[in-house]
Amino acid sequence: MRVRYKPWAEDYLKNHPDLVDMDGAHAGKMSEWFEKEQPIYIEIGSGMGQFITTLAAQYPEINFVSMEREKSVMYKVLDKTKEMGLKNLKMICNDAIELNEYFKDKEISRIYLNFSDPWPKKRHAKRRLTYHTYLALYKQILKDDGEIHFKTDNRGLFAFSIESMSQFGMYFTKMNLNLHDEDDEDNIVTEYEKKFSEKGSRIYRMEAKFHKCFE
């Protein structure tokens, strides 16, 4: 998704009450940003925020974190959060490679990866959010029974992710090769998903966990 630069976005984000600061004072203490201590789910690459705000509204018993690196997009999520009166959703404006600056080990119950940039060129594989470098970060912050929910319209990225996760010691608990041809009442459609499914694009989805290590 190409984002149009908005020069005023950075000033808008500064000191916003729903945006987690980056001074490190709260690193590993994400629960302190919320009114209640509840399980934490995060979405990496939230875009315009339709998915994460819908989830937060449906599940008040869960705390949600939206992680988006584009300041020119993040303000939309902040606006939706305020309009909907969501007390269980906070935002981080940073790259996923910095995850362990915000979350301590085994703090997160679920990670959502929705329509991540496929980085189709082979030399850019390490930038994909299912590359082993990122999987190592996810394993570090996820609880032992934590999950990764992944959704894409890119067949190449889906195949790469299956291979990458398998090689990293993960297993799949659910897999959809054509999501919109199946009756999945729990599916929340993102802006991107709606646009491309209406054009006939196939949507791929899977849920995965890390194997537990036994001594």
UniProtKB/Swiss-Prot annotation:
Record's catalysed reaction(s): guanosine(46) in tRNA + S-adenosyl-L-methionine = N(7)-methylguanosine(46) in tRNA + S-adenosyl-L-homocysteine
Enzyme Commission number(s) from the entry: 2.1.1.33
PROSITE patterns in the record: SAM_MT_TRMB (PS51625)
Keywords: Methyltransferase, S-adenosyl-L-methionine, Transferase, tRNA processing
Pfam families: Methyltransf_4 (PF02390)
Residues binding S-adenosyl-L-methionine, per UniProt: E43, E68, D95, D117
Gene Ontology molecular function terms on file: tRNA (guanine(46)-N7)-methyltransferase activity
The organism's place on the tree of life at top rank: Bacteria
SUPFAM superfamilies with a match to the protein in the record: S-adenosyl-L-methionine-dependent methyltransferases
Cellular-component GO terms for this entry: tRNA methyltransferase complex
Binding site for substrate: K121, D153, T190, E191, Y192, E193
Gene3D superfamilies attached to this UniProt entry: Vaccinia Virus protein VP39
Pathway: tRNA modification; N(7)-methylguanine-tRNA biosynthesis
Active site annotation, chain numbering: D117
Role summary: Catalyzes the formation of N(7)-methylguanine at position 46 (m7G46) in tRNA.
Family according to the record: Belongs to the class I-like SAM-binding methyltransferase superfamily. TrmB family.
NCBIfam families: PRK00121.2-2, tRNA (guanosine(46)-N7)-methyltransferase TrmB
The protein's name in its UniProt record: tRNA (guanine-N(7)-)-methyltransferase
